[in-house]
Amino acid sequence: MPLLDSFTVDHTRMAAPAVRVAKTMKTPHGDTITVFDLRFCRPNLEVMPERGIHTLEHLFAGFMRDHLNGQGVEIIDISPMGCRTGFYMSLIGVPEEQRVADAWKAAMADVLKVTDQRKIPELNEYQCGTYHMHSLEEAQEIAKHILDNGVVVNHNDELALPKEKLQELHI
């Protein structure tokens, strides 16, 4: 099985909240797709609650598009990580990390402005696979954590696992 890019960085040294370019690739037509690691929590030390991350998934996707799309950037998808420490965001374009960080903070401010759980988009059995598993309060606690702590940039060259360590881990 091929080694995925996300497993070549040292999770014990990742800062959070932080933006990291996880991968860039070119499509056959020459467009650049960039995948960002939006790390909300420090790996293996913190985790987002399942109801909060689920609600955030519904809110974050729209709010990030409001603040980031345009000027050569179009978000394809924003999905929570299975480890519940962040989200992956795939987009067309190559925005600077600071632009992404600023959009992320603006999106978190928007989450704090949502006044009622009934205002969560697609919160029904027809559009959500687990529509009863939501918490606006938890999503807002996550958003407040981001705004209180700020967003830094994680750099792959600073987090790269040495080849010796990858061999030691049998990868």
Swiss-Prot record:
It comes from Serratia marcescens. GO terms for biological process: quorum sensing. Involved in the synthesis of autoinducer 2 (AI-2) which is secreted by bacteria and is used to communicate both the cell density and the metabolic potential of the environment. The regulation of gene expression in response to changes in cell density is called quorum sensing. Catalyzes the transformation of S-ribosylhomocysteine (RHC) to homocysteine (HC) and 4,5-dihydroxy-2,3-pentadione (DPD). This is S-ribosylhomocysteine lyase. Its EC number is 4.4.1.21. PANTHER family: S-RIBOSYLHOMOCYSTEINE LYASE. Fe cation binds at H54, H58, C128. Gene3D superfamilies: S-ribosylhomocysteinase (LuxS). The lineage of its organism: Bacteria, Pseudomonadati, Pseudomonadota, Gammaproteobacteria, Enterobacterales. GO terms for molecular function: iron ion binding; S-ribosylhomocysteine lyase activity. Belongs to the LuxS family.
